[in-house]
Amino acid sequence: MESVEKNKHLIRHLKIQRSAYEKQSSTTAQDNVVLSIMANSTLTTLTLSSNEVGDNGAQVLSEALKTNSILTTLILKRNKIGSYGAQALSEALNINSTLTTLNLSSNSFGSYGAQALSEALKINSTLTTLNLRYNAIGDNGAQALSEALKTNSTLTTLMLSGNSIGDNGARALSKALKTSSTLVTLILNNNSIGDNGAQALAEALKINSTLTTLKLVRNSIENNGAQMLAEALKINSTLTTLNLEKTLIGDNGAQALAEALKINSTLTILNLDGNSIENKGARALAEALKTNSTLTTLHLHVNWIGENGAQAMAEALKINSALITLDLSNNRIECNGGQALCEALKTNSTLTFFNLEGNSIGDNGAQALSEALKINSTLTTLRLYNNSIGENGAQALSEVLKINLTVTILN
């Protein structure tokens, strides 16, 4: 820590690992370290993750933040900060006017801590990014934050994954989204949100005109929730990224989203990984891709689209001129599906990233791919791991790479 003290007027970014902070012999010594750092006149980013800062350390940081006018980013994840520590930091946010990013993920302050931070957000006018992942804030914490969002006019990114907010919390946040004009990114992964919560969010998306990114990974929104979100996408004109990975939407949900893609003209990234989508859902999405001209990234990793679904996707790729990234890994595509996709690559001129891992396309699929790569001049990344490709297939790919100069990454 001596070097930090000596150079404290030169350092702009500082990351203190657990060993450096915890080696201090007492709480007082640790507090002195923090105070010394915060007295720095150039430091803009401070990372103290996994240092067992606790409530006492958070209180020391809070006092320093009240007078510090330089620091813009503070990262305190995994620090055993409880509700008292969150309360202390909230008091600092009432006064501090320079901090723009605060990461408090994986602490333990619960709903009381979230409520304290929410009160601060009603006053604070500089914070733009707040990460509260995995803090057990529950629906009460989400409700408090939603009230703050109705007043706050600077926060643009809110991360609340792993907080068990449930449908009630999702409904509360949805109400805030109807009036918020600044929030652009909302991450609600792994929150026990069901179709009712998804429906509430969908209603908000019909009105909201600022949100560009919504992530609902590992929530049980299922078919009904997907249908509601799909209806919202037909109206919404600002959302560009929607992540519904592992949300149990199935074929029916995929079909509903496909219908939305025929109308929507703003969504660019759609993630449907791990949703038990079979060839029926894949065919629907493929039909949408024939007319959609804005989607650039589609993730369908770990679904069951099979040969028929792959063939439908291949037909879409012959027509579509917008898609840049396509992930069809682990989809039971096999040889025939692989060959169909390779035929499409001969005419497609936009796809640059293609993931076919874990599809058992075999030597015949690899040979078909090598023929496609003699013609295709846009693909730069191709992933083929775990495809039962033997010596003949590997040889064919090896030979074509002597000719093809655009593929730079081949797994």
Task: Tell where the protein language model's regions lie, with residue ranges.
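Leucine-rich tandem repeat or coiled-coil scaffolds
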Residues: 1-411
